[in-house]
């Protein structure tokens, strides 16, 4: 996982996916104040993903703000050939736990709701996923991105251990 630099972000063609829009209300003695929150995921379907949470008086403004925040939080994720991940990974954010696992070719994305939208935005095509605990969409997305950011390729593992790649693959 690497955080993208400003000049790298400009070149990307990002696809935006709206996960949720929520109307919230602040009640005072005099009246009720309504506003909107929006959760947006942006990704290039080639290993780059980001999420944003925006708040505004109008729904369109909240969606726009969320999209701009998502552009600022882009991460590069390691994807291996076949559209899957290198190894199993689990992550927890607040009450939400997410477990992602590589799958064989032709399996597709088996995941629910918010987790699925993150995996699609990254560009994964064959992944198994299980979400436990809280079903809060914001926390599930943060846990999924945390799990994806913990993924390591064979090259990084070989560098950390100071041994050759073939020794890791063969054993």
UniProtKB/Swiss-Prot annotation:
Superkingdom to which the source organism belongs? Bacteria
What InterPro entries does the record point to? Ribosomal_Su5_D2-typ_SF, Ribosomal_uS5, Ribosomal_uS5_bac-type, Ribosomal_uS5_C, Ribosomal_uS5_N, Ribsml_uS5_D2-typ_fold_subgr
Q: Cite a single GO BP annotation.
A: translation
Q: Quick one: a GO cellular component term?
A: small ribosomal subunit
Extract the GO molecular function terms from the UniProt entry: rRNA binding; structural constituent of ribosome
**SS bond list:** none
Domain S5 DRBM: residue ranges: 14-77
Q: Which Pfam families match?
A: Ribosomal_S5, Ribosomal_S5_C
Domain description: The N-terminal domain interacts with the head of the 30S subunit; the C-terminal domain interacts with the body and contacts protein S4. The interaction surface between S4 and S5 is involved in control of translational fidelity.
Do you know which PANTHER family this protein is assigned to?
A: S5 DRBM DOMAIN-CONTAINING PROTEIN
The entry's family comment says:
Belongs to the universal ribosomal protein uS5 family.
State the function annotated in the UniProt record. Answer: With S4 and S12 plays an important role in translational accuracy. Located at the back of the 30S subunit body where it stabilizes the conformation of the head with respect to the body.
State the protein's name.
Answer: Small ribosomal subunit protein uS5
């Amino acid at each position: 996982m690497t955080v993208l630099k400003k000049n790298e972000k400009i070149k990307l063609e990002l696809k935006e996916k709206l996960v949720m829009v929520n109307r919230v209300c602040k009640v005072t003695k005099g009246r009720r104040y309504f506003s909107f929150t929006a959760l947006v995921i942006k990704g290039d379907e080639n290993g780059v993903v980001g999420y944003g949470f925006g708040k505004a008086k109008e729904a369109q403004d909240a969606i726009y703000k969320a999209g701009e925040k998502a552009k600022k939080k882009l991460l590069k994720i390691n994807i291996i050939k076949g559209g899957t991940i290198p190894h199993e990974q689990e992550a927890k954010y607040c009450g939400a736990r997410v477990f992602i696992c590589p799958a064989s070719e032709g399996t597709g994305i088996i995941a629910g709701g918010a987790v699925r939208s993150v995996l699609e935005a990254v560009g994964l095509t064959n992944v198994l996923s299980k979400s436990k605990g809280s079903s809060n969409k914001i926390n599930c997305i943060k846990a999924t991105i945390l799990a994806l950011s913990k993924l390591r390729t064979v090259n990084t593992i070989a560098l950390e251990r100071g041994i050759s790649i073939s020794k890791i693959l063969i054993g």
